[in-house]
A protein has these predicted regions:
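Extracytoplasmic copper-binding redox domains, predominantly the cupredoxin/blue-copper superfamily
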Residues: 1-80
Protein backbone atom coordinates (compact mmCIF):
# COMPACT_ATOMS: atom_id res chain seq x y z
CA UNK A 1 0.00 0.00 0.00
CA UNK A 2 1.48 3.35 -1.01
CA UNK A 3 1.52 6.12 1.57
CA UNK A 4 1.16 9.32 -0.43
CA UNK A 5 1.14 12.83 1.03
CA UNK A 6 -2.62 12.85 1.70
CA UNK A 7 -3.91 9.30 1.24
CA UNK A 8 -3.27 5.57 1.17
CA UNK A 9 -3.45 3.89 -2.25
CA UNK A 10 -5.43 1.76 -2.47
CA UNK A 11 -7.70 3.06 0.28
CA UNK A 12 -9.44 -0.34 0.62
CA UNK A 13 -7.72 -3.70 0.15
CA UNK A 14 -9.32 -7.17 0.14
CA UNK A 15 -6.96 -10.07 0.89
CA UNK A 16 -7.07 -13.74 1.94
CA UNK A 17 -5.98 -14.66 5.47
CA UNK A 18 -2.24 -15.28 5.70
CA UNK A 19 -1.26 -12.28 3.56
CA UNK A 20 1.62 -9.99 4.55
CA UNK A 21 0.69 -6.36 3.82
CA UNK A 22 3.43 -3.77 3.38
CA UNK A 23 2.96 -0.01 3.48
CA UNK A 24 5.65 2.07 1.72
CA UNK A 25 6.01 5.80 2.30
CA UNK A 26 6.13 7.19 -1.24
CA UNK A 27 5.31 10.74 -0.15
CA UNK A 28 7.51 13.60 0.88
CA UNK A 29 6.31 13.75 4.50
CA UNK A 30 6.54 11.55 7.59
CA UNK A 31 3.65 9.07 7.93
CA UNK A 32 2.48 6.30 10.22
CA UNK A 33 0.03 3.40 10.14
CA UNK A 34 -2.14 2.68 13.19
CA UNK A 35 -5.12 0.33 13.48
CA UNK A 36 -8.19 1.79 15.17
CA UNK A 37 -8.41 -1.34 17.33
CA UNK A 38 -4.74 -1.12 18.40
CA UNK A 39 -3.79 -4.42 16.73
CA UNK A 40 -0.86 -2.82 14.87
CA UNK A 41 1.00 0.48 14.80
CA UNK A 42 4.14 1.60 13.02
CA UNK A 43 6.82 4.00 14.15
CA UNK A 44 7.02 7.28 12.25
CA UNK A 45 8.08 6.41 8.70
CA UNK A 46 10.34 8.74 6.74
CA UNK A 47 10.00 8.92 2.94
CA UNK A 48 11.14 5.59 1.48
CA UNK A 49 10.64 3.57 4.68
CA UNK A 50 8.17 0.69 4.98
CA UNK A 51 6.14 -1.25 7.56
CA UNK A 52 4.64 -4.76 7.24
CA UNK A 53 1.89 -6.64 9.09
CA UNK A 54 0.76 -10.27 8.63
CA UNK A 55 -3.04 -10.62 8.51
CA UNK A 56 -3.75 -14.18 9.65
CA UNK A 57 -7.36 -13.89 10.85
CA UNK A 58 -10.48 -12.85 8.94
CA UNK A 59 -11.93 -9.46 9.77
CA UNK A 60 -12.11 -5.82 8.78
CA UNK A 61 -9.30 -3.55 9.93
CA UNK A 62 -9.59 0.24 9.79
CA UNK A 63 -6.36 2.21 10.01
CA UNK A 64 -5.14 5.79 9.96
CA UNK A 65 -2.02 7.91 9.59
CA UNK A 66 -1.61 9.61 12.96
CA UNK A 67 -0.08 12.65 11.26
CA UNK A 68 -2.70 13.15 8.52
CA UNK A 69 -5.78 11.21 9.58
CA UNK A 70 -7.81 14.34 10.19
CA UNK A 71 -7.14 15.28 6.54
CA UNK A 72 -8.65 11.96 5.45
CA UNK A 73 -5.59 9.70 5.34
CA UNK A 74 -7.41 6.54 6.38
CA UNK A 75 -7.76 3.05 4.97
CA UNK A 76 -9.37 -0.36 5.34
CA UNK A 77 -8.19 -3.96 4.95
CA UNK A 78 -10.77 -6.73 4.59
CA UNK A 79 -9.39 -10.21 5.33
CA UNK A 80 -11.39 -13.27 4.24
Amino acid sequence: IAMLDDRFAPKRLEIPAGTLVTWINKGGNWHSVAAYDGSFESQNLAPGESFSVPFDSPGTFQYICKHHGMQGMQGQIVVS
